[in-house]
From Swiss-Prot:
Main location: membrane
Annotated InterPro entries: ATP_synth_B-like_membr_sf, ATP_synth_b/b'su_bac/chlpt, ATP_synth_F0_bsu_bac, ATP_synthase_B_chain
Topology relative to the membrane: Single-pass membrane protein
Record-level Gene Ontology MF annotations: proton-transporting ATP synthase activity, rotational mechanism; proton-transporting ATPase activity, rotational mechanism
Protein name as it appears in the record: ATP synthase subunit b
Organism whose genome encodes this protein: Bacillus anthracis
PANTHER family documented for this protein: ATP SYNTHASE SUBUNIT B (PTHR33445:SF1), ATP SYNTHASE SUBUNIT B', CHLOROPLASTIC (PTHR33445)
Length: 168
């Protein structure tokens, strides 16, 4: 006897056969398709989880490396600043040494020049004294040789002084 399903007459055998085939299909799908599909999905899930873990580890390692690089950069900057400060101090020290040496050399040159000037002054005075003495002797001998009037003596002295001025 046919059973009515949704107002349509479908024989019971067809329903039972269709139900049996459907259940058989479900069992076969579960055994042959669902298991392998679930296995593949499980593998894929594990693979994705492993990839996420690896990415997180890599990210953590990258952050650690970035922090290390920042520390190294900071240390390099500190060392560079210290090096610059040492170089500046060394330059100032060298400048002080050079300036002191230049002052010492200038004082030495100045002292030497003063000594040279003093020596030349003494030589000039000695030469002048010798010349004056010589001229005095010459004038005296000429005055003695001839007795001159006062005018002639003055003229003679002026001539000798003029002669000495031209000789210089």
């Amino acid at each position: 006897m046919p059973t009515l399903l949704l107002g349509a007459a479908i024989p019971f055998g067809t329903i039972a056969y269709t139900l049996f085939i459907f259940l058989l299909l479900l069992v076969m799908l579960r055994k042959f398709a669902w298991g392998p599909l679930m296995g593949i999905m499980k593998e894929r899930e594990e693979h994705v989880a492993n990839e996420i873990d690896a990415a997180e580890r890599n990210n953590a390692e990258a952050k650690k490396l970035v922090e290390e690089q920042r520390e190294m950069l900071k240390q390099s900057r500190v060392e560079a600043q210290e090096l610059i400060e040492r170089a500046k101090k060394q330059a100032v020290d060298q400048k002080d040494v050079i300036v002191a040496a230049a002052k010492e050399e200038a004082e030495s040159i100045k002292a030497s020049a003063v000594q040279e000037i003093q020596r030349e002054k003494e030589q000039a005075i000695a030469a002048l004294q010798e010349q004056v003495a010589s001229l005095s002797v010459q004038i005296a001998s000429k005055v003695i040789e001839k007795e001159l009037k006062e005018e002639d003596q003055v003229k003679l002295i002026r001539d000798y002084i003029k002669e000495v001025g031209e000789a210089r």
